[in-house]
């Protein structure tokens, strides 16, 4: 079942391909453990359903357009202008755009730039909270891959699918940490509601 879900994720979303990293880690790391070693089973081959999902997507592109990577050409065109750049370059671009584009900085560029560092910090907290390495690996790869986007305008929406962040926040053991998460969530919810009612949507 997990393989089928991974297949569908990779078929419908590029980030779905990233599930291959925690899946392979789970199989390999479990087999290499000295204690509680997990034997590799034939059902573990289901991890290969994940890249097969993306392969089917490429086949659909080829069948419809004669080019397996036609979707990249669509993303590069108007109005998306999507390219791939190094994470550091994109973070710097977010900062520059926040300075140059008045009115958009508070709803697009500052949040996207800050979100990267907040997400990275949450993943580090996950190490302290002993979150399973498969989840941390997926969260890190997902974060890095998402911020390779050379013209990002929906970073917050993309990061909504980074489920390890929610698992980590839900597992914070410190009482003060839990209250801090609750307070921050409430404050941002209030800010979002205010901006929405003010016509920033």
Regions found by a protein language model. Give the residues of each.
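Transmembrane-helix signature of polytopic, lipid-linked glycan biosynthesis machinery
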Residues: 58, 137-154, 168, 187-201
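Membrane-interface junctions at the ends of membrane-embedded or membrane-associated helices
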Residues: 1-2, 27-42, 169-184
């Amino acid at each position: 079942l997990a393989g089928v879900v991974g297949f569908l994720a990779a078929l419908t979303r590029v980030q779905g391909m990233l599930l291959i990293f925690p899946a392979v880690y789970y199989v390999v790391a479990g087999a290499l453990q000295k204690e509680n070693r997990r034997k590799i089973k034939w059902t573990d081959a289901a991890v290969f359903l994940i890249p097969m999902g993306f392969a089917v997507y490429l086949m659909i592109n080829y069948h419809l357009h004669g080019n397996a990577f036609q979707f990249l050409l669509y993303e590069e065109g108007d109005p998306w202008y999507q390219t791939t750049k190094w994470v550091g370059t994109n973070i710097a671009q977010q900062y520059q755009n926040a300075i140059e584009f008045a009115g958009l900085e508070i709803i697009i560029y500052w949040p996207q730039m800050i979100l990267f560092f907040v997400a990275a910090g949450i993943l580090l907290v996950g190490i302290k909270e002993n979150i399973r390495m498969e989840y941390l690996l997926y969260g890190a790869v997902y974060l890095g891959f998402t911020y390779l986007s050379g013209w990002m305008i929906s970073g917050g929406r993309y990061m909504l699918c980074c489920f390890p962040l929610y698992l980590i926040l839900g597992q914070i053991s410190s009482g003060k940490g839990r209250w801090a998460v609750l307070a921050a969530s409430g404050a941002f919810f209030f800010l979002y509601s205010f901006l929405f009612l003010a016509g920033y949507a």
